[in-house]
Amino acid sequence: MQSTTVERLPSGQSSAILPTENGTQLSRDEMKNLEQLLQVGTTILSQALDLLNNSLTSDDQLIIHSQYMPGSTIGKHLRHARDHFTLLLDCVSRPRPYALSYDVRSRNTPMETSREAARTAIEDTIAQLKQVVPGVSLDAPLTLHAVTPYSQTMQSTFGRELWFAGLHAVHHWSMIRVIAGEQGIQLDKSFGFAPSTLVHQGTEASLGKAKI
């Protein structure tokens, strides 16, 4: 069993430096950063749940093609954004060395056409985030493979890619906002805006100053 190191703070309080599954100990600062990234990731994915539970009223709304972005549907953007989270989490759930490619994705999945399937998929990813993130070092190295269209290999970290997955999802939520607008669907005012934008505006919405 892993032992837990306890650091004494100036105030006399104690803060555990918890070991990850591979034995690497996390400092207080790293634990805080991981908690913040986890909060952002789960909040962004929860926005998708809110969309599915409270904004969409039929499965057909998932598959209507945008007039402004040919080929785009709400369902496709939900699936694509979720893919980046699951690919990253699956990557760091395997033994090291970590190798990640965002180009290995599933298409035409049930969540693209079914609100219930999409809801289940998003809920599963939120649960996976909560299970995996606390046990991985923020600076855990991974090799990223990408097609740009040239084959590229570069070095990154788990923390950087977790941040990217959240920002990437917000980008796709903004496109969902456009498609929803075409269909006359009303969305929460914070849906599809970057966290930095919400913080700048001082909004009380999710990911604004009141939440971070």
List the predicted regions and their residue ranges.
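Non-transmembrane, amphipathic alpha-helical segments
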Residues: 29, 33-36, 40, 66-73, ...
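Helix-loop segments that flank and shape redox-cofactor active sites
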Residues: 47-73, 89-110, 147-157
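Individual transmembrane alpha-helices with interfacial aromatic-anchor signatures
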Residues: 154-167
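Substrate-binding/catalytic groove segments of enzymes
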Residues: 134-137, 172
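A cross-kingdom marker of C-terminal helix-rich interaction/assembly modules
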Residues: 12-59, 89, 177
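Alpha-helical transition-metal enzyme core signature, strongest for iron centers
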Residues: 41-48, 74-88, 115-129, 165-176
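Short conserved catalytic/interaction loops centered on acidic-Pro-aromatic/His motifs
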Residues: 173-191
